[in-house]
Amino acid sequence: MTQLQEARKGIITPEMVQAAELEGITGEELRQKIAIGEAVLPCNINHQGLRPMAVGKGLSTKVNANIGTSDAYPELAPELSKLEIAVAAGVHSIMDLSTGGDIDEIRRRIIQDSPVMVGTVPLYQVMVDTHKAGRGLVEMTDDEIFAGIEKHCRDGADFITVHCGVTLEVIQELREQGRVMDIVSRGGSFITAWMLHHQRQNPLFEQYDRLLNIALHYDVTLSLGDGLRPGCLADATDGPQIKELITLGSLVKRAQEAGVQVMVEGPGHVPLHQIETNMQLAKTLCHNAPFYVLGPLVTDVAPGYDHITSAIGGAIAASSGADFLCYVTPAEHLGLPTEEDVKEGVIAARIAAHAADLVKGIKGAWEWDLEMAKARKALDWPKQIQLSIDPEKAGRMRKAKNEDSQERCTMCGKFCAYQLISDYMGTPFKGC
């Protein structure tokens, strides 16, 4: 049985117990959230050594890091290094988006080495394999699509992105309304090209029950991809995006009725004043299923700094209902991320997630900040470094800027606020 089926039968699984402990809640509380579809617990029966984590309403905001090869950079070793760096930086999930090299070997090694849940986009590999076979990208068959999906599930992917909501009707809406950037989702563009070439409905939509049967067998969580997500602010919250979201809402119910865990993916590029509306729409139209957002990026003009534009949007999105943030690295829109880009992306997204958890009242979030405040008041530098979201960087910067014997730090020097106020408040001053 899947975690959803177990939850509906009143069974608290060992995975639920482990995930609940990380949240500071009981297994029964988590079971109830999973049973009604407001939380998912992605844990493929074939992913050995997984540390189960739940995603959903009332739980801490989770962060995903995308890694994976490209045709230009097909080597496995750098991606395993990125996995290690992301996990060390506190990521909760990894997605392997590989399109270069030995994709099967890369995916299997990432799943084998990852202690956190792993997601994939099977359609990417189907497209690559079709191209390698000397055929046009639109010449992949229905059977090849579903065989590719089953292979990823069999290998242990805990969740898979599937672009089931990109239908002929949604594409007609796009044609009628128009957009600045049309379709920026790789999976969405592949499916659209396939449908227009064959003049047929999306097989992932048309044969959705076939997909559900595969997911049910391996207890794979479906992540319903947003193929019409906006790729720029000008396209945000438009007709094609919302029409697809309505379609995804109906697919959420069908998955849950079949006993399959399901979450929904969201935008994208969204201006600040539209983010809360987008989160409310998604939660309402998709029956409070967990919502997984890329960013959202709040401006289009900051290549090289999109980990910042994403963190701004992510904090607002998560505080408004999003449950899962996909990181964005400084390399977004520019090229494949390096190991350092991966770490920066994870930390930026974790900052956004934590800022939102403070608003949502997640257990332990407020206490973390309070402990930092107390450490600062006490001028306890080792404690401050320990409590930092990135202790390595904080410690390195502290050491580079200050001598161990200094009474004050180099920011304020003899004008230290702590020393000044201690003279009048009677608080002992230890020095920095």
Swiss-Prot record:
Substrate binds at residues 66, 95, 124, 163, 185-187, 226-229, 265, 292. [4Fe-4S] cluster binds at residues 409, 412, 416. Pfam families: ThiC_Rad_SAM. It catalyses: 5-amino-1-(5-phospho-beta-D-ribosyl)imidazole + S-adenosyl-L-methionine = 4-amino-2-methyl-5-(phosphooxymethyl)pyrimidine + CO + 5'-deoxyadenosine + formate + L-methionine + 3 H(+). GO terms for biological process: thiamine biosynthetic process; thiamine diphosphate biosynthetic process. Pathway: Cofactor biosynthesis; thiamine diphosphate biosynthesis. It is an enzyme of class 4 (lyase). GO terms for cellular component: cytosol. It comes from the Bacteria. Keywords: 4Fe-4S, Iron, Iron-sulfur, Lyase, Metal-binding, S-adenosyl-L-methionine, Thiamine biosynthesis, Zinc. Its cofactor is [4Fe-4S] cluster. Belongs to the ThiC family. Catalyzes the synthesis of the hydroxymethylpyrimidine phosphate (HMP-P) moiety of thiamine from aminoimidazole ribotide (AIR) in a radical S-adenosyl-L-methionine (SAM)-dependent reaction. This is Phosphomethylpyrimidine synthase. It comes from Desulfitobacterium hafniense (strain DSM 10664 / DCB-2).
